[in-house]
Every structure is written in structure tokens, then in C-alpha cells.
């Protein structure tokens, strides 16, 4: 038997009975990409309004007696609802679905069926898989390329069918029904039980599917195909939005246009040209800045070399600069006896460092300097450089170098 969410995708709440409630765990994505394990319960109901993940469609969210349902998964002919609080078997409960999420999934899923059918009918482009994403959805087509003309024709056709208000119906067929052989589909799960659900867009397509769908294409409102991207080997990914997602996309795009108009001081039609001019100007500034930085590095190297303080340990810190700046100084000086300790970046924050000098000394001191500055680095042939997180500890690193030089001098 199909769940209530499949029999009536527009139902938003209903009353049912708890069949069982057992301890369970749920692995979720936490901040920083780490996994978090929640302890809770798997609640099984006599029937459910909440769709369990399947057919490329994510699961629903909702509540059971105002207790949040964090995940819904199918197990054979039943659905497991994960909650953090238990519910008593045999008790009657009120189930509500997160309608905004549900209707969005209905629009994207029915939109996928429509695009898949039209792409096949017009150009023989077969769908091999699809993904209902959080912001956009992707249909994988069995073709190495799809032309802009084909995309435009598919988009025009699907939107005409939406305007034609074609009905969408759901039927259940038995496994031995001969009609099953003529229905589009990618096979059934190994643990499938009961009749086969067939979703039909009148005059366009019939497809085996377990998901929730609109009852009429007019509920899709509009479909926008954003374009295609190269997919897996000999495949193309077609990216699309349906229904309310198109409106949200237009709102974001309009907001970006308004912001760019204000920043660039020009009309929408001139945005691209204005950005190109800014990019060219920035490249020229970067080139000029690099030349000046190189000249400064050469001048700095000569100043250090001719300084009365030359010898032993020579240090220099500049807030502005990069690894190239430090390497130019080291190359110009070419010190084989003096330890040269260069740093660039925020004096109390993060930055870069370079240690140059006698190969044996640098090999010994480089990792220790990195440790003092709470950074990482690598080196060879008398040069060690890396990133530091605590430039505020430069004085400690300098003291370490001075102690080493003093010890070496005393031994000589």
C-alpha cells in the first residue's frame, strides 16, 4: 500500500496511530564538515504524511505531535521517522508536513519528469540520473553535448505544456500487469513491496516513480533551464529550476543587478563592459605594484648588505610584501655566512617568513623557527620558508637565531 503522502501529495496534516518506537541514532552534518551523531528514536506509524527519501527526491520534514521529525527513511513497506523524543506505541498522533519544503520538492520532481520526457521526445536525449539539489536541480543526459538551440527548444516546449494545464495522474499497477513493460523507469529497489506506482503527464509521459507530484502542470508555474555543464564520461548535466525557485532566483538576480548598478555607476546593459574595464585596470595596477615591489626588494637588499650591522643575524620585517619580495632580497644578498631572517605580514597576526644562510644552520634552525611562530614550512639548499600564524613571536625567533650564532662563535 502506498503512503498517504503518495496517495494525496497535497495533504498537509492528518491523524494516525504509533505502531512502534525504538532507540536509534542519526548521523548528521555538523559545522566544519564534521559528522555528528544524534541519539533518538525511530517511530513507525500506521500511515504517514511524510515522504521517505527515494526516486531522487529528498525526504520530508515535519512534526508528530509538535515533535520535529529530522529524517524519514523507507524500510521495506514502512517508514522510519527519526525524532529526539519518544512516542508511545498505540497512541494517536497529529502529523504535519513542512509544506514549503514538500511543495518545492513536488515542483522540482514533476519538472524533472516533464523535462526528461520532452528532451527524449524532441531529441532522443535519455535521462540517466537526476539530483534534486537544495538550490538547483540537475538532470544527467546520455549525450556528450547539448546545444543551446536544443536547450531553448526544450524550455519552450515544457513551458507551453505548463500553460496547457496538462493533468498529472498517479495509478497503481500490479507487478504482472503488461503495461508495466511500457512504462519509463530505472528499475525497482530490491526491497520493493506492493503495487507499482505510475505517474502520468497526460499525452506526454508515463513513468514509474515513488515521489510526490503536482496534480496539474499549471502548479509548476514556470521552468527555467539555466544551461548545461560537462558531466561524467560522455554525459551532460542540464541544470534547471521550477516554480517558486524561479521566482527566488529572479529576486536574487534583481538584487545583484541593483547592487552592481550602484557600485559600477552604470545601467544593467553596461555591467559586463564596466567589470572588464575594472579587471584590466586591476591587472595593470598589480603589474605596476609588482615592479615597484621588486625594485624595493633590490634596494632593501643593498641597504642591508651595506649596513654597519651586517653580519651574524640580519632581520627585516615589512607589513607589505610576499614570498617573492623575500626571495628577491635573499637572491640579491646571496649570503652564505650570515643568517638572514625575513618576515612579511601583520605584526601581530599571520604572515610569511624566510630564513636563508649556511645550509647546515638553516636545516637545523628552520623547523625550530616555524615552531616558534606556530607555522609550517619547508626548505633546501640554505633556504627555509613558510607560513606563520603568530608573527608577534618574531622576537623569540630572533633570539633563537642569535643564541645559535653566539654558540657557534664561542665554539670556534
From Swiss-Prot:
Zn(2+) binds at residues 109, 113, 209, 213. InterPro entries: Ala-tRNA-synth_IIc_core (IPR018165), Alanyl-tRNA_Editing_Enzymes (IPR051335), Thr/Ala-tRNA-synth_IIc_edit (IPR018163), Transl_B-barrel_sf (IPR009000), tRNA_SAD (IPR012947). GO terms for cellular component: cytoplasm. PROSITE patterns: AA_TRNA_LIGASE_II_ALA (PS50860). Keywords: Cytoplasm, Metal-binding, Phosphoprotein, Protein biosynthesis, Zinc. Its cofactor is Zn(2+). One of its GO terms (biological process) is alanyl-tRNA aminoacylation. It comes from the Eukaryota. Binds 1 zinc ion per subunit. Belongs to the class-II aminoacyl-tRNA synthetase family. Alax-L subfamily. Functions in trans to edit the amino acid moiety from incorrectly charged Ser-tRNA(Ala). This is Alanyl-tRNA editing protein Aarsd1.
Amino acid at each position: 500500500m502506498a503512503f498517504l503522502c503518495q496517495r494525496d501529495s497535497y495533504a498537509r496534516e492528518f491523524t494516525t496511530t504509533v505502531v512502534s518506537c525504538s532507540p536509534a541514532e542519526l548521523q548528521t552534518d555538523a559545522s566544519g564538515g564534521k559528522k555528528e551523531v544524534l541519539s533518538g528514536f525511530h517511530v513507525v506509524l500506521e500511515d504517514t504524511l511524510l515522504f521517505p527519501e527515494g526516486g531522487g527526491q529528498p525526504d520530508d520534514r515535519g512534526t508528530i505531535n509538535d515533535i520535529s521529525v529530522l529524517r524519514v527513511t523507507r524500510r521495506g513497506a514502512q517508514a522510519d521517522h527519526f525524532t529526539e523524543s519518544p512516542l508511545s506505541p498505540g497512541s494517536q498522533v497529529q502529523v504535519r508536513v513542512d509544506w514549503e519544503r514538500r511543495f518545492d520538492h513536488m515542483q522540482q520532481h514533476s519538472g524533472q519528469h516533464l523535462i526528461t520526457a520532452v528532451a527524449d521526445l524532441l531529441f532522443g536525449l535519455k535521462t540517466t540520473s537526476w539530483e534534486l539539489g537544495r538550490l538547483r536541480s540537475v538532470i544527467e543526459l546520455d549525450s556528450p553535448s547539448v546545444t543551446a538551440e536544443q536547450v531553448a527548444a526544450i524550455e519552450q516546449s515544457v513551458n507551453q505544456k505548463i500553460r496547457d494545464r496538462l493533468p498529472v495522474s498517479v495509478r497503481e499497477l500490479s507487478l504482472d500487469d503488461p503495461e508495466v513493460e511500457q512504462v519509463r523507469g530505472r528499475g525497482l529497489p530490491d526491497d520493493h513491496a506492493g503495487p507499482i506506482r505510475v505517474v502520468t503527464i497526460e499525452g506526454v509521459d508515463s513513468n514509474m516513480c515513488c515521489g510526490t507530484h503536482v496534480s496539474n502542470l499549471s502548479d509548476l508555474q514556470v521552468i527555467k533551464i539555466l544551461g548545461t555543464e560537462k558531466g561524467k564520461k560522455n554525459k551532460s548535466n542540464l541544470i534547471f529550476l521550477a516554480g517558486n525557485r524561479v521566482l527566488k532566483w529572479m529576486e536574487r538576480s534583481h538584487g545583484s543587478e541593483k547592487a552592481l548598478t550602484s557600485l559600477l555607476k552604470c545601467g544593467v546593459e553596461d555591467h559586463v563592459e564596466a567589470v572588464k574595464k575594472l579587471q584590466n585596470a586591476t591587472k595593470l595596477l598589480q603589474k605596476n605594484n609588482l615592479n615597484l615591489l621588486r625594485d624595493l626588494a633590490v634596494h632593501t637588499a643593498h641597504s642591508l648588505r651595506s649596513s654597519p650591522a651586517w653580519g651574524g643575524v640580519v632581520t627585516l620585517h615589512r607589513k607589505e610584501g610576499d614570498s617573492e619580495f623575500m626571495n628577491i632580497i635573499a637572491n640579491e644578498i646571496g649570503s652564505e655566512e650570515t643568517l638572514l631572517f625575513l618576515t612579511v605580514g601583520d605584526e601581530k597576526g599571520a604572515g610569511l617568513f624566510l630564513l636563508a644562510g649556511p645550509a647546515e644552520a638553516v636545516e637545523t634552525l628552520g623547523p625550530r623557527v616555524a615552531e616558534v611562530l606556530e607555522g609550517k614550512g619547508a626548505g633546501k639548499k640554505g633556504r627555509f620558508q613558510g607560513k606563520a600564524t603568530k608573527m608577534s613571536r618574531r622576537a623569540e625567533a630572533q633570539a633563537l637565531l642569535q643564541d645559535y650564532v653566539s654558540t657557534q662563535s664561542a665554539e670556534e
